[in-house]
From Swiss-Prot:
Record HAMAP family: Methyltr_PrmA
EC number: 2.1.1.-
InterPro entries: Ribosomal_L11_MeTrfase_PrmA (IPR050078), Ribosomal_PrmA_MeTrfase (IPR004498), SAM-dependent_MTases_sf (IPR029063)
GO molecular function ontology, one term from the record: protein-lysine N-methyltransferase activity
Subcellular location: Cytoplasm
Keywords: Cytoplasm, Methyltransferase, S-adenosyl-L-methionine, Transferase
Residues holding S-adenosyl-L-methionine: 162, 183, 205, 248
Primary role: Methylates ribosomal protein L11.
GO biological process, one term: methylation
Protein name, UniProt field: Ribosomal protein L11 methyltransferase
Keyword Cytoplasm: yes
Pfam families linked to this entry: PrmA
Family the UniProt entry places it in: Belongs to the methyltransferase superfamily. PrmA family.
Length: 312
């Protein structure tokens, strides 16, 4: 089978939105090449070794590569992707050039080459995220492993917003907590919450591909006795109270449901949000406070923030 590599030149702010559009269009895998990875300072508190080749990164902006099987409808698929990307500026998301290029890739090349982008990454004191094909031995008895299959959808869960959400969960989840994960994607946050001692986690996503991906990853991590996955639009029709809600979504989506979050999370419960570019921290904080939340802590990583807020 022949494959097409669709490359989109965009901005760091648009990475999650463009990646989601590509997954929605049926991409069999997505890789992100961000030149900021070459120069950023790294904590290296877990003994990581980084081997990055500058020749594989664009001079500026971010390059997102997605892989589609060559079919008669590929041109229509690409046109649909372009149309969806062109709409993003109306949501105040800067897309940069938005240039799209297409290259042919042999199946045998695709089957192995894309895996070079994914390796075990220890993202916190507790968790290491490991691609399913990698063999990995925990460095201590307390280290927890989350296995993910990036080939299914939604990457490996190592984006700064996901990392901050997991670190926020480490700070806040108590044994026996009831939790809702809004916009679960790969299910990584729900899996983390279950491994931290939650007694029940409801994971929701509007995208049926995300639901399928999350269900697979939940089973893979043997947390399906705690995590239930379902299709739903944000918190529509969801009743509480729960101890904690976590949502790693675009800022524009988070702004749609602070009042619903305040309705569903118990008094004194927590709402953890990320997916927020730093420039939009203020507008999200104000919306949460207007809904009755108090901002307890703001986590920062690169150009992103995560907010831990407590309900009145």
């Amino acid at each position: 089978m022949k494959w097409s590599e669709i490359s989109i030149h965009t901005t760091e702010e648009a990475v999650e939105a463009v990646s989601h559009i590509l997954h929605e269009a049926g991409a069999s895998g997505v890789a992100i090449e961000d030149p900021a990875e070459l120069t950023k300072e790294r904590e290296q508190q877990y003994g990581e070794i980084y081997a990055l080749n500058p020749d594989e990164y664009p001079a500026e902006g971010v390059l997102i590569k997605a892989y589609f099987p060559q079919t008669d409808s590929l041109h229509e698929t690409i046109a649909g992707v372009k149309s969806s990307i062109d709409v993003l500026p109306s949501y105040d998301i800067e897309i940069g050039t938005g240039n799209i290029t297409v290259n042919e890739v042999n199946e045998e090349d695709w089957a192995t080459a894309w895996k070079k982008y994914y390796h075990p990454v220890q993202i916190s004191d507790t968790f290491t995220i490991v691609p399913t094909w990698e063999e990995y031995t925990p460095s201590s008895p307390d280290e927890k492993i989350i296995e993910l299959d990036p080939g299914m959808a939604f990457g490996t869960g190592t984006h700064p917003t996901t990392t901050m959400c997991i670190r926020a969960l480490e700070k806040t989840v108590q044994p026996g907590d009831n939790i809702i994960d809004v916009g679960t994607g790969s299910g990584v946050l729900s899996i983390a919450a279950a491994k931290l001692g939650a007694s029940s986690v409801q994971a929701y996503d509007l995208d049926p591909v995300a639901v399928e991906s999350a269900e697979m990853n939940v089973r893979l991590n043997k947390t399906d006795d705690i995590v239930s996955v379902g299709q739903n639009s944000l918190l529509e029709g969801i009743e509480g109270p729960v101890d904690l809600i976590v949502a790693n979504l675009l800022a524009e989506i988070i702004l749609l449901f602070p009042e619903d979050a305040a309705r569903v999370v118990k008094s004194g419960g927590l709402f953890i949000t990320s997916g927020i570019i730093a420039a939009k921290e203020k507008v999200i904080s104000e919306a949460l406070e207007k809904a009755g939340f108090t901002i307890e802590e703001v986590l920062r990583m690169e150009d992103w923030v995560a907010i831990i807020a407590r309900n009145a």
